[in-house]
């Protein structure tokens, strides 16, 4: 029985050597799982993700003066409401939080920029004018939302020193 066991070792070593050496070329290439935007249909599909998924209305309302004064009886429904209504630093990272709004808007801007880049790569055909317009609109809207939530109100006196938001016009 012992002799039969040792007969299989050379075959196993040979099989392992062949298996491991045959993967060399496959592992040398970096996988690229990005979708190539090379047709009108793919660009149109990409624009579906150029809209923010986060609803910023609650955040805007809670940090504004558009609220009822209930005296000492007001209680927050969740941590997001408490932080927004009392102007505390935002630590809440769930749905509709400042954190998710920031990330979702920049994901949407990236999708719009990808569509615009694909349209430019295709030579700006007039058949893609509606998609180009939608991508520009989505990019502008997302920047508008971000600047209204995260930036100071414009002041000619302090506009050169006030911080704004990163304005993304190209793919990263």
What does each model-identified segment do?
Residues 2, 23-25, 112, 140:
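Terminal processing/anchoring signals of secreted or surface-associated proteins
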Residues 22-67:
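Membrane-proximal, proline-rich intrinsically disordered regions
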Residues 55-60, 142-154:
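Secretory-pathway/luminal and periplasmic proteins that interact with or process carbohydrate-rich
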Residues 59-88:
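N-terminal, post-signal-peptide region of Sec/Tat-exported proteins
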Residues 67-68, 131-138, 159, 168:
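Acidic helix-start/capping segments at beta-turn-to-alpha-helix junctions
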Residues 82-150:
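Conserved, well-structured interaction surfaces
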Residues 149-172:
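Short coil/linker segments at helix-helix boundaries
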């Amino acid at each position: 029985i012992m002799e039969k066991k040792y007969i299989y070792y050379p075959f196993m070593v040979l099989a392992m050597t062949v298996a491991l050496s045959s993967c060399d070329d496959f592992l040398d290439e970096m996988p690229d799982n990005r979708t190539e935007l090379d047709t009108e249909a793919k660009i149109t599909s990409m624009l579906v993700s150029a809209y923010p998924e986060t609803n910023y209305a609650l955040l805007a309302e809670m940090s504004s003066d558009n609220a009822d004064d209930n005296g000492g009886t007001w209680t927050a429904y969740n941590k997001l409401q408490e932080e927004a209504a009392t102007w505390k630093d935002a630590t809440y990272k769930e749905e509709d939080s400042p954190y998710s709004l920031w990330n979702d808007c920049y994901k949407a801007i990236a999708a719009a920029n990808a569509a615009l880049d694909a349209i430019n790569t295709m030579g700006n055909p007039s058949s893609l004018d509606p998609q180009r317009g939608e991508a520009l609109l989505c990019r502008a809207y997302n920047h508008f939302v971000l600047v209204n939530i995260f930036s100071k109100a414009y002041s000619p006196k302090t506009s050169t020193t006030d911080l704004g938001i990163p304005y993304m016009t190209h793919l990263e």
